[in-house]
Amino acid sequence: MATLFIADLHLCAEEPAITAGFLRFLAREARKADALYILGDLFEAWIGDDDPNPLHRQMAAAIKAVSDSGVPCYFIHGNRDFLLGKRFARESGMTLLPEEKVLELYGRRVLIMHGDTLCTDDIGYQAFRAKVHKPWLQTLFLALPLFVRKRIAARMRANSKEANSSKSLAIMDVNQNAVVSAMEKHQVQWLIHGHTHRPAVHELIANQQPAFRVVLGAWHTEGSMVKVTADDVELIHFPF
């Protein structure tokens, strides 16, 4: 058996091929897993659990079917869907996890997260993140009419796209000191995360020992998952 990790699907109505690929993944690979962990940015945007978007209802039902089959499903918020709440988690049968979580997997201690908190060189983004994660601001936003939230979210996405276009690739990647600090704080030799869309297995030193950082790929033209078994930790890409 295996534990599976995915991230950065950025599901939206404009990308039906990705949605179809995810549904096939849930019907096949996910059903055979010990557990499924979704490490953020499952959706391209999330403006509240009360959004009647048909895609959200479809995904909730599909994930719930996996959960009901006996495969536990877990979710860590990403930078796109950090407002996903308890209502959707309940509808989809997912358990919401904190932004950093340590798992005991087949004899390994593994730290999992979305990954945006590791990009400490992107000072502008980190300031924005700190602001939008304030509970009072989230409560205020979610109290707004749905059409107002949609307009605000569209404007924020446009601003983010414009800002990122002028940033260097290095700034938007993880900071190595932040990586080592997180791994040493949690006393782990394995870290799995998404966010950067740069799939790879990196070797480093943490806790004065060899360590590994596994980065999930985004679901653009193919699927990406990390498969952890008693024997191995694999980064796997597969066609939709």
UniProtKB/Swiss-Prot annotation:
Enzyme class: hydrolase
Entry's Gene Ontology cellular component terms: cytoplasm; extrinsic component of plasma membrane
Membrane topology: Peripheral membrane protein
One Gene Ontology molecular-function label: manganese ion binding
Residues annotated as binding substrate: 79-80, 122, 160, 164, 167, 195
Amino acids binding Mn(2+) 1: 8, 10, 41, 197
Pathway in which the depicted protein is active: Glycolipid biosynthesis; lipid IV(A) biosynthesis; lipid IV(A) from (3R)-3-hydroxytetradecanoyl-[acyl-carrier-protein] and UDP-N-acetyl-alpha-D-glucosamine: step 4/6
Subcellular localization(s) per the UniProt record: Cell inner membrane
UniProt keyword list: Cell inner membrane, Cell membrane, Hydrolase, Lipid A biosynthesis, Lipid biosynthesis, Lipid metabolism, Manganese, Membrane, Metal-binding
InterPro entries the record matches: Calcineurin-like_PHP_ApaH, LpxH-like, Metallo-depent_PP-like, UDP-diacylglucosamine_Hdrlase
Cofactor annotation: Mn(2+)
Reaction it catalyzes: UDP-2-N,3-O-bis[(3R)-3-hydroxytetradecanoyl]-alpha-D-glucosamine + H2O = 2-N,3-O-bis[(3R)-3-hydroxytetradecanoyl]-alpha-D-glucosaminyl 1-phosphate + UMP + 2 H(+)
Pfam families in the record: Metallophos
Protein name: UDP-2,3-diacylglucosamine hydrolase
Annotated source species: Escherichia coli O7:K1 (strain IAI39 / ExPEC)
